[in-house]
Amino acid sequence: MASKEKKLGRVVVVMGGTSAEREVSLMSGSGVLKALRDARVDAEVFDPQVQDIEELVSKDYDRAFLILHGKGGEDGVIQGLMEYIKLPYTGSGVFASAISIDKVMTKKVWESIGIPVPRGTTVTADSNMAEIIRLLGKNLIVKPSKEGSSIGLYRINDATPESLSEA
């Protein structure tokens, strides 16, 4: 039986990046790197914030373990690069990533195939905040449509047009 090192080849753990979730990615990536190395897998790190993309492209990796979060990591960008350079990678593909990073688009897709989703609406600076409160109620959760984890999440109890605008 082939060793894991030979079976998996050279693995690049793509972590860090430039999103608001950089620190989470670095912690997750460090855990992945340690687990791979503990399993005697030939693994090394690539961080797009501190390394040039040419370094990733020019090295002869056999596969990539993607552990980037948020913009640039879960939005189809790094997945598109992996497909362009023909490097197999973990996680969702370009299309699924591009759709799922956008909560508004994801909700529309889910609704279109009959998956129940909570009531909600897209809020912009031009939105009628009083009308949104009338439709959804005074206890609201507000979240950016394209951030991951709980970045930018606000819980508003007894919302007013002003508190909703601030969020």
Task: Give residue spans per PLM region.
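Short secondary-structure junctions
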Residues: 114-116
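Glycine-rich phosphate-binding loop of ATP-grasp-fold ATP-dependent ligases
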Residues: 25, 118-120, 139-167
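ATP-binding N-terminal substructure of ATP-dependent carboxylate-amine bond-forming enzymes
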Residues: 1-95, 99-108, 112, 122-132
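A general structural motif
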Residues: 8, 137-139
